């Protein structure tokens, strides 16, 4: 490709409304342009990267035995009513009517459509297992689209769905997809971690997320320093206390604490050990008999809302009680709450169950109890794992301790079981002629999200530093003053033809531009390898090669340059 015949569209200035580096650089590098909130057009450079990501995804899916199909982006509402998600999905589901007043949705996901397809096309166990995938545009009407294509309303996704009659083949396909996703991200040259994950709104049992590691990542990953164990912070298991509860050494006493509304203020003002304090959070209960539930964690720990949401006594989705409701039930407000004398179900974290002589709110405004002890001052409450893990704690496999990293979720695989097939009556006849509900798996990759995540992991102060496999171009040719030198023009043109002939994606900057502008554009769009041609190079019989990632420069003889560049891509 010649720049003179290409829409490069680079920008010098960082757009003011772009919050994260990937959004900034995708705009500056001329990869995307905003059409409306959360809606983007891909310009040539962006589309080249998107297509390379898509190609790797497609190759690995085919290699894993999945079969490509294509389903409509527009879906009939009847299918969503059938599964119950018409009411459950919320405002992210864009709904509309056609000219015949029939309800439709713009698909955020395709479980309903694929299940409907399979129940009509597959009738016998002999046709199973089956794994079908598509690479298709999705739409989710995000309340606040942000971060460019990282969280846009319209996005490109690979979604696969597998169907099984037995758990064994479902597990085999799950493992194959796990490996395929690992292969996809490895081939793209990205540092990543697969992590145990919560199944979220899609539901199901087994679930893993695939995270591209980046300091800007929204998700916190807890991983083992001594094994492959890793989990989303929402899913990471807290260790059970190994120590016994200490004996009571303090008397229970009521203390005035008028200026201590938070744990931090309480600790600072009274010189307390934060591990000897607890936080009490009031949430809505799941039953009329217990409309409120108290959740208690140690002062230095954080409540894990996903874990709490799964408690039988707690209403789902988890909802914190408003202050007015708390005051009406307890007579005090947040900052002064605690377990002593609390007239509602109390669930404590396991770490709280071994505490002694601890401090908590007294359920009276501006007052706390110090020296609280279980089974002396109050009954030992029900205990559960309801907190986030902490760095340095032992991991569940016993092979290391927790460390933390930030990541960007780009893939998610689920074992759905019969969540959709049962509600949609997707069945087949087994070998005995009996009707059996299908088991399902679901496997998603955010194709456009990978593009942004790759940038968040690979950039410097000059622009994007693409991994080789997904760079828009592999090689950039920079002829210095080619419009003033026939020698430079001839050699640049010949090199361009030679590299193109061996299948290397090459961009020849044949503009009448200053060298500084040409170098800046090549570095901004992140081309991995650049070759500089000038009269001095020609006199010496060498090209000047520069590696975008390392900054390394070296002279390469004319007759060796093609093989040199081919070897770099091997």
Curated annotation (Swiss-Prot):
Reactions it catalyzes: tRNA(Pro) + L-proline + ATP = L-prolyl-tRNA(Pro) + AMP + diphosphate
GO CC terms, sorted: cytosol
Enzyme superclass (EC): ligase
Keywords: Aminoacyl-tRNA synthetase, ATP-binding, Cytoplasm, Ligase, Nucleotide-binding, Protein biosynthesis
Annotated localization: Cytoplasm
CDD domains noted in UniProt: ProRS-INS, ProRS_anticodon_short, ProRS_core_prok
Major subcellular location class: cytoplasm
GO term, biological process aspect, one: prolyl-tRNA aminoacylation
Pfam families recorded: HGTP_anticodon (PF03129), tRNA-synt_2b (PF00587), tRNA_edit (PF04073)
Keyword Cytoplasm (UniProt): yes
EC numbers on record: 6.1.1.15
Keyword Ligase annotated: yes
Record-level Gene Ontology MF annotations: aminoacyl-tRNA deacylase activity; ATP binding; proline-tRNA ligase activity
Family: Belongs to the class-II aminoacyl-tRNA synthetase family. ProS type 1 subfamily.
Protein name from the UniProt record: Proline--tRNA ligase
Natural source organism: Shewanella sp. (strain ANA-3)
